[in-house]
From Swiss-Prot:
GO terms for biological process: L-tryptophan biosynthetic process. PANTHER family: N-(5'-PHOSPHORIBOSYL)ANTHRANILATE ISOMERASE. The lineage of its organism: Bacteria, Bacillati, Cyanobacteriota, Cyanophyceae, Nostocales. Belongs to the TrpF family. Keywords: Amino-acid biosynthesis, Aromatic amino acid biosynthesis, Isomerase, Tryptophan biosynthesis. Pfam families: PRAI (PF00697). The keyword Amino-acid biosynthesis applies. The keyword Glycoprotein does not apply. The gene is trpF. Its EC number is 5.3.1.24. InterPro entries: Aldolase_TIM, PRAI_dom, RibuloseP-bd_barrel, TrpF_fam. This is N-(5'-phosphoribosyl)anthranilate isomerase.
Length: 210
């Protein structure tokens, strides 16, 4: 199962989190976010990582040109779209960056949002389902209604996000079978500052499932 830790801001933490077991790291390219990092900061965190770690930039309502430039400058392997991007935009981006994984994050609060998610599947590589918040795009600490997702079986891989922590991850995975999980605020001391003890506890809990 993929494990993505999002909102990385410090190079030394990126290396430590990868060594603890993360398969993907996320870097926030949204200037209004408290976890925002510049291209130079992303490169500093990405450069020492092993090749097998996915390096994903998180964007919201950015232009294709801006996204493409950041991918090139930072050596990103994936782009996560967390804004109001349309399926058509996702398709254009995927054609523009054919070697890069395209993830679309959707903030879910109703079955209608889940139906919308299905529309995206043919234009992207991976879906990410997050909790809805009217102001914030992610990292809110709010959980999804897991029960609503019981019958969610999209045609592409999907990641579960939204308020996941080392304390509730086993409960979430007992109810759902996502292809991966995405954590941010649930393993932090404060926005952008990851708590390595919590990250270690997360992988300890995940290891106990085997």
């Amino acid at each position: 199962m993929r494990v993505k830790i999002c909102g990385i801001t410090q190079p030394q933490q990126s290396v430590a989190i990868a060594s603890l077991g993360a398969t993907a790291l996320g870097f926030i390219c949204v200037p209004s976010s408290p976890r925002y990092v510049t291209a130079a900061q992303i490169w500093a965190a990405v450069a020492p990582l092993p090749k097998n770690i996915d390096k994903i930039g998180v964007f919201a309502n950015s232009s294709i040109a801006e996204i493409k430039q950041t991918v090139i400058d930072c050596g990103l392997t994936g782009v996560q779209l967390h804004g109001d991007e349309t399926p058509e935009f996702c398709d254009q981006l995927r054609r523009s960056l054919p070697q890069v994984e395209i993830l679309k994050a959707l903030r879910v609060r109703s079955l209608e949002h889940l139906e919308q998610a299905i529309i995206y599947t043919q234009y992207i590589n991976t879906l990410l389902l997050d909790a809805y918040h009217p102001q914030q795009l992610g990292g809110t600490g709010q959980t999804l209604d897991w029960q609503m997702l019981h019958k969610f079986h999209p045609s592409c891989p999907w990641l579960l996000a939204g308020g996941l922590t080392p304390d509730n991850i086993l409960e979430a995975l007992s109810q759902l079978n996502p292809d991966g999980i995405d954590l941010s605020s649930g393993v932090e001391r404060k926005p952008g500052d990851k708590d390595l003890d919590k990250v270690a506890l997360l992988f300890e809990k995940l290891g106990s499932r085997n």
